[in-house]
Amino acid sequence: MFNNDLRYKLADDAINKLFSAFPENKKVEDILLKISVINDLYSTNILATYQMAVHIQKLDIDTKVRAGNIDVVNEIATGHNIIRKDINTELNFYSFATKYCNWHNQDDYAIYDRFVSKTLTAYNKEYSFSNFKQTDLKDFRKFKQILEDFKKHFNLNKHNLKEIDKFLWVYGKKNFPSNYQKN
């Protein structure tokens, strides 16, 4: 279904092309371009894209992302000093960080979003494929293990993380629609 919808297929193709053209995270302008595209196509709500780009550049993530280092997700998601002013708290951009890492290394990084979360929770309630709490989905190490449990339970080992993600997202979007749907 995902690849049959031209909107999603072409968006994925565009992001793949962009990340192939700018695979490194050395130049702020390259990082800013990638952030802006992910932010627009995935509605990740990063209003301070320049600040996030500088943050990612300072982290020097290229070697770690290629190696599939799980800690990179949290490093990107936090420590950027993008503050929610009304409560004076740094925002956690976990969902964005999973997407940014995924587009650099789709074999080692899965994408987290509300649709994936709702789908995994619903499947676990019905089939008990893994022992997890809702908060575990926002811990990338645990999230990745939950996805492995899902793959094993449903005999999906021939499918990669990207294919599993697309299924979870499409299922969640269809079965757990939000009040606001971006076209």
Stretch-by-stretch model annotation:
Residues 1-88, 106-183:
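An N-terminal alpha-helical hairpin/helix-loop-helix interaction module that forms a charged
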Residues 96-101:
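Short hydrophobic alpha-helical segments that form membrane-spanning helices or hydrophobic packing faces
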